[in-house]
Amino acid sequence: MGKITFYEDRGFQGRHYECSTDHSNLQPYFSRCNSVRVDSGCWMLYEQPNFTGCQYFLRRGDYPDYQQWMGFSDSVRSCHLIPHSSSHRIRIYEREDYRGQMVEITDDCPHLQDRFHFSDFHSFHVIEGYWVLYEMPNYRGRQYLLRPREYRRYHDWGAMNARVGSLRRIMDYY
């Protein structure tokens, strides 16, 4: 079980809303979100309702300002509690529809291009576990939640291009 508290103002001030489950529309509870406290669980925050828009991964901890979670604005309109998984395995492909060179990984990778010498990554098959995909190396840039399923092209995980820099397992739940 997870617990997250959203605050309208920076530094955990102003109106707040406590949550322990997925919410597809947080708009009725607060108009803006400038700070967050995660008491338990791992969460993906979304800039828009219905789990759309920019995504932000948060684990247990205090985030006194939206820039602390790499946010572009104070807009948080939906959230997803990420289920626990004990094992992680993902296949990454050089081309769309699982074509081209394929590699399977089970650990974090801070710099995919250096490790695998692909210039782009066009499809993924998440076999086990939940992962955060980052647009740039060293876990920076836009973030995308990957859950166990197939992603035949970059549009399937919500990206506008096939630029992928790093990949991290979601493991820290408490």
Curated annotation (Swiss-Prot):
It comes from the Eukaryota. One of its GO terms (biological process) is lens development in camera-type eye. One of its GO terms (molecular function) is structural constituent of eye lens. It comes from Rattus norvegicus. There are six different gamma crystallins identified in rat lens. Signal peptide: none annotated. Keywords: Eye lens protein, Repeat. Has a two-domain beta-structure, folded into four very similar Greek key motifs. This is Gamma-crystallin F.
